[in-house]
């Protein structure tokens, strides 16, 4: 880890070793300048001498990256001295071409007693937009609707619950009866009349990241558990994420209508509750505060109790947010896609403030001047307040699902901060390149110092770097959440011999750029939930394979089959005939004596150019393994000889070491089926 981050010298720091033993995360250590400096100033005597001197002015700008020899020129010192000092400070494999990052340069300048006007800030991709946010104003806090996430195992009835509450056919619109991406809806609860926003997170394991994201932006989690199946793998996974999120939880035991007998139903419900207790869920039965409600979304039984429980729990939680139009609006991207005749669209769940037409939003590497707001029924609305999910039109590019949305005053400010974020991305990218370059140079130096082993090392390195065969794919989906889920699903497929390699993953039908990239990288394009593709895409000139799917199981199955076909073949010998060597005789051909094996076929058929093994003795020791050169019957060349007939045989490679009593085994190399 230390080498990967380029902090070679950190591992010599005693304090760092103590912290590592305490299991403090490496990223925290890497950003701690105090820890770094402690190693640099460990030699107290020298440090005390330097501190007494007056700081020297810095007359040059600190670059993001600089080689050791160029830094020596800027410092006006001998490069040998700088390398010696760096080595003393713990750097390894330092050469004149070793590249230093800006952070290291700043520490070196401090060591050389230079005055630094501006040290690198701790701004990173996670907090680059934090200064755009406004502090919470308690006076503006008003009650808002709870955001409820329904989680659970696939086909345990999550979408059916929302279908009941919305009185619409959500289930019928989904391929295979399984929700394919997050939907966000605000409803008026049938009994209380209170507003509730639901996030319907998919139950398929492929959508793990989307479900995690749902848990992080919700207030209440409704965990659905089928009374027939009890806790399943994805149920346990949902429990884990719910615990980590710290959200309040309600358990809904579903499909009770399938068990009409009261005693049997009660027994099944009791089993589910006991299983929940084993998983550490503090249900009311043992004095906890987690409600367990048996329901049937199909018949409506106890659905009013579920709705009432959500409303009452939200009132106890006293959920509030700033609802003033003057408050800087914030939210989360729940879904994003490209719609025909509309363009880039993103569903935003409002966290605070109010979204209105004309406001400027920033998100990731894109921004938006709101052209229109559309509710979940497809109706344009004037504004969206906290806990409301709305489609926002007007994005320059498709934002990523899960990214935070922040309101800004102008497009100029949005562009300024996006540029700042892109610079950080570029620095991060360059940092990886620099680390790799330094490691390659260090390796080259080591190989140069060990010339006698250079060839062996090169061969070993080639074998190690060859790695598994990569099957390239480009993923195109209807929405970004599905694109991410498909990418995650197939990226994990494969083994040490063959693996999936996702070249790119994006939203919309395949473009000309996608086709060119597929041609260059020899990729197959996987389209998910895109409907009918244009004929010019399917019948593209480059002959790129384009496969279309509506259900993720089928996509994963096809990719797995392709990987299986690309596994290295394994063959086993299958004996198809046995032949006895009865005698040997010599035959003169063009002044050359050729020894021929006089044989009789015991079973099967021997063919010209057959693969054979000549074996000898009771243990059938192999004395020859190769092909037949000639096959004769009554002095005539023949293509094959069948059981019971005699023949004369010569072998390739000039093998003549056979003798009477030997046995010839005729075999075929049969490919053994392999599976991932």
UniProtKB/Swiss-Prot annotation:
A Pfam family annotated for this chain is IF2_N
Instruction: Give the region (G3) as residue ranges.
Output: 200-203
Could you tell me which residue ranges the tr-type G domain spans?
Answer: 143-326
Which GO biological process entries does UniProt record here? Answer: mitochondrial translation; mitochondrial translational initiation; translational initiation
Region G5, as annotated, extends over: 296-298
Predominant cellular place of this UniProt entry's protein: mitochondrion
Recorded hits in Gene3D superfamilies, A to Z, give: P-loop containing nucleotide triphosphate hydrolases, Translation factors, Translation initiation factor IF- 2, domain 3
Residues covered by region (G1): 152-159
Could you tell me the keywords of this UniProt record? GTP-binding, Initiation factor, Mitochondrion, Nucleotide-binding, Protein biosynthesis, Transit peptide
The residues listed in the UniProt record as binding GTP, with positions renumbered to this chain, are 152-159, 200-203, 254-257
In this chain, the stretch annotated as G4 covers: 254-257
Q: At the top level of its lineage, which domain of life is listed?
A: Eukaryota
Q: Which NCBIfam families match?
A: IF-2, small_GTP
What remark does the entry add? Present with 1400 molecules/cell in log phase SD medium.
Which family would the database say this protein is a member of? Belongs to the TRAFAC class translation factor GTPase superfamily. Classic translation factor GTPase family. IF-2 subfamily.
The protein's role, per its UniProt record: One of the essential components for the initiation of protein synthesis. Protects formylmethionyl-tRNA from spontaneous hydrolysis and promotes its binding to the 30S ribosomal subunits. Also involved in the hydrolysis of GTP during the formation of the 70S ribosomal complex.
Q: What is this protein called?
A: Translation initiation factor IF-2, mitochondrial
Originating species: Saccharomyces cerevisiae (strain ATCC 204508 / S288c) (Baker's yeast)
This protein's encoding gene:
IFM1
């Amino acid at each position: 880890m230390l080498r990967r981050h380029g902090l070679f010298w950190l591992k010599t720091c005693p304090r760092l070793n103590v912290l590592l033993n305490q299991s403090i995360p490496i990223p925290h250590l890497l950003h701690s300048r105090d820890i770094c400096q402690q190693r640099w100033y460990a030699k107290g005597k020298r440090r005390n001498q330097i501190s007494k001197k007056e700081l020297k002015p810095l007359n040059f700008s600190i670059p993001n990256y600089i080689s050791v020899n160029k830094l020596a020129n800027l410092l006006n010192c001998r490069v040998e001295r700088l390398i010696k000092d760096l080595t003393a400070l713990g750097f390894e494999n330092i050469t004149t071409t070793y590249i230093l990052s800006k952070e290291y340069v700043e520490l070196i300048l401090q060591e050389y007693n230079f005055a630094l006007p501006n040290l690198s800030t701790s701004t990173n991709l996670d907090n680059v937009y934090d200064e755009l946010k406004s502090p919470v104003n308690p006076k503006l806090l008003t009650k808002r609707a709870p955001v409820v996430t329904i989680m659970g195992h696939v086909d345990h009835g999550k979408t059916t619950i929302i279908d009941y509450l919305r009185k619409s056919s959500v289930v019928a619109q989904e391929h295979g009866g399984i929700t394919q991406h997050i939907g966000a809806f605000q409803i008026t609860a049938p009994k209380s009349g209170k507003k509730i926003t639901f996030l319907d997170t998919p139950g398929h394991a492929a959508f793990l990241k989307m479900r995690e994201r749902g848990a992080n932006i919700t207030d209440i989690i409704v965990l659905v558990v089928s009374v027939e199946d009890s806790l399943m793998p994805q149920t346990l996974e949902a429990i884990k994420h719910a615990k980590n999120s710290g959200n309040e939880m309600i358990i809904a035991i579903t499909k009770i209508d399938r068990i009409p007998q009261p005693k049997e139903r009660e027994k099944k419900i009791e089993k589910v509750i006991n299983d929940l207790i084993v998983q550490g869920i503090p249900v009311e039965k043992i004095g906890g505060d987690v409600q367990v409600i048996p329901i049937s979304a199909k018949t409506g039984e106890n659905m009013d109790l579920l709705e009432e429980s959500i409303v009452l729990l939200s009132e106890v939680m006293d959920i509030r947010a700033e609802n003033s139009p003057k408050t800087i609006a914030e939210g989360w991207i729940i879904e994003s896609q490209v719609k025909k005749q509309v363009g880039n669209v993103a569903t935003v769940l409002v966290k605070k403030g109010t979204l209105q037409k004309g406001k400027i939003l920033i998100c990731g590497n894109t921004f938006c001047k709101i052209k229109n707001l559309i509710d979940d029924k497809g109706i344009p609305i004037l504004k969206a307040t906290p806990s409301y999910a709305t489609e926002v039109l007007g994005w320059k590019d498709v934002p990523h699902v899960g990214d935070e949305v922040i309101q800004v005053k102008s497009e100029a400010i949005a562009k300024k901060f996006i540029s700042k974020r892109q610079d950080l991305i570029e620095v991060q990218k360059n940092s990886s390149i620099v680390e790799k370059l330094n490691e390659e140079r260090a390796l080259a130096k080591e190989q140069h110092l060990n010339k006698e082993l250079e060839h062996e090392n090169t061969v070993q390195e080639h074998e190690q770097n060859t790695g598994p065969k990569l099957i390239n794919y480009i993923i195109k989906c209807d929405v970004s959440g599905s694109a991410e889920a498909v990418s995650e699903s197939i990226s994990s497929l494969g083994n040490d011999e063959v693996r999936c390699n996702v070249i790119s993953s994006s939203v919309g039908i395949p473009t000309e750029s996608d086709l060119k990239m597929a041609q260059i990288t020899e990729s197959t394009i996987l389209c998910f939930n895109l409907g009918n593709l244009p004929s010019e895409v399917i019948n593209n000139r480059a002959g790129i394979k384009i496969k279309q799917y509506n259900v993720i199981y089928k996509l994963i199955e096809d990719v797995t089959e392709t990987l299986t076909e690309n596994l290295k073949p394994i063959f086993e010998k299958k004996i198809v005939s046995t032949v006895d060597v009865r005698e040997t005789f010599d035959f003169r051909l063009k002044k050359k004596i050729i020894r021929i094996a006089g044989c009789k076929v015991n079973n099967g058929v021997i063919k010209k150019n057959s693969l054979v093994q000549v074996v000898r003795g009771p243990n059938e020791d192999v004395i020859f393994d190769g092909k037949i050169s000639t096959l004769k019957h009554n002095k005539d060349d023949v293509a094959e000889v069948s059981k019971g007939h005699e023949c004369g045989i010569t072998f390739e490679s000039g093998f003549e070491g056979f003798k009477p009593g030997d046995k010839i085994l005729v075999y075929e190399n049969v490919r053994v089926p392999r599976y991932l």
